[in-house]
Amino acid sequence: MTPPATPLTPTLQLAHDLIRCRSVTPEDDGCQELMIRRLEAIGFKTERLRFGEVDNFWAIRGGDGPILAFAGHTDVVPTGPETHWNNPPFEPTIIDGMLHGRGAADMKGSLASMVVACENFVARHPNHKGRIAFLITSDEEGPSINGTVKVVEWLEARHTKMTWCIVGEPSSTTRVGDVIKNGRRGSLGGVLKVKGIQGHVAYPHLADNPIHTLAPALAELAAEHWDNGNEFFPATSFQVSNINGGTGATNVIPGEVTVVFNFRFSTELTDAILRERTQAILDKHELKYELEWILSGQPFLTPRGDLVNAVVDAINTATGLDAELSTSGGTSDGRFIAPTGAQVVELGPINATIHKVNECISAEDLNKLTAIYERTLEILLA
């Protein structure tokens, strides 16, 4: 017997419409216009903000008072060969209660839940307290240069500050709402080039092998105890992601070796301290080197307060779960918003299939997520 079809609630219908847009980063492909039309229909004032090849928008509703912002991205990662998918990735399909499609979990499902939650809330509270806002970009899965960070700069120039911000990243692990990300580690990358003298492997005395001279320093960096972490963050980690040296020939000592590495660091350290300690180790080994640093984001933490308490309460009301607060995982656009002074959390669907072939999410989870967002609005702004 064929199982009954999953009814398309307003959230699921909007999620379908968004997934149909082929918004591979940095393309938006009409997602934002779909959202803008819905938001303007309930009284939001919107500003389309294009920086470079990236579409962004800021939408706000309400006269004055604290701002509760929903932040998210319409861009998705590439699908890979579409033939590897069970269903075309941009043709949303519900199978056995699971909504399939690129972006279903990351993060078009969250966007649909946010919009419908606001529609429901405004219908009941047309004269709500404070303000509701949306900060949406199509540059989160890419370099993140012309997206949220630029919108935040634009807001700061207008002296507009978010009070609370919910980023719709897929934070949940096994049940929707089981985990809230209330902070993230910082990310500091480095590209290290160590110089040597190229030569023949049979005549090492006429060359200087940079791989050999680098090895002890690299071993020390890998073994270094950077900090102990704290109650909110694990200890800082150092990881090498790439090593490249040599000409491709088996009988040539390379003249240069390049190492790419990354720190994920806690609030116990600053990026300046990490740079100083790294360079001290390299200098101790008397390497001839060049080092380029890339700071992707500072660590941030939103302790228990208005926003965290509201979201925890909303999750418990909608699902019965007691959410876990976590700072694990990679970086998100929350790193650009937290430095403004806003309280920031990430709350979204289950992340088990994000960036994978056959990305999918429970259809019912999106309805629950809508209820969670709606309840959060009630607590903070009703």
Curated annotation (Swiss-Prot):
Its EC number is 3.5.1.18. SUPFAM superfamilies: Bacterial exopeptidase dimerisation domain (SSF55031), Zn-dependent exopeptidases (SSF53187). Pfam families: M20_dimer, Peptidase_M20. Pathway: Amino-acid biosynthesis; L-lysine biosynthesis via DAP pathway; LL-2,6-diaminopimelate from (S)-tetrahydrodipicolinate (succinylase route): step 3/3. One of its GO terms (molecular function) is cobalt ion binding. Keywords: Amino-acid biosynthesis, Cobalt, Diaminopimelate biosynthesis, Hydrolase, Lysine biosynthesis, Metal-binding, Zinc. The keyword Hydrolase applies. The active site is at 75, 140 (proton acceptor). GO terms for biological process: diaminopimelate biosynthetic process; L-arginine biosynthetic process; lysine biosynthetic process via diaminopimelate. Its cofactor is Zn(2+); Co(2+). CDD domains: M20_DapE_proteobac. InterPro entries: ArgE/DapE_CS (IPR001261), Bact_exopeptidase_dim_dom (IPR036264), DapE_proteobac (IPR005941), Peptidase_M20 (IPR002933), Peptidase_M20_dimer (IPR011650), Peptidase_M20A (IPR050072). Zn(2+) 1 binds at residues 73, 106, 169. It comes from the Bacteria. It catalyses: N-succinyl-(2S,6S)-2,6-diaminopimelate + H2O = (2S,6S)-2,6-diaminopimelate + succinate. Zn(2+) 2 binds at residues 106, 141, 355. Binds 2 Zn(2+) or Co(2+) ions per subunit. Homodimer. PANTHER family: ACETYLORNITHINE DEACETYLASE, N-ACETYL-L-CITRULLINE DEACETYLASE. Belongs to the peptidase M20A family. DapE subfamily. Catalyzes the hydrolysis of N-succinyl-L,L-diaminopimelic acid (SDAP), forming succinate and LL-2,6-diaminopimelate (DAP), an intermediate involved in the bacterial biosynthesis of lysine and meso-diaminopimelic acid, an essential component of bacterial cell walls. This is Succinyl-diaminopimelate desuccinylase.
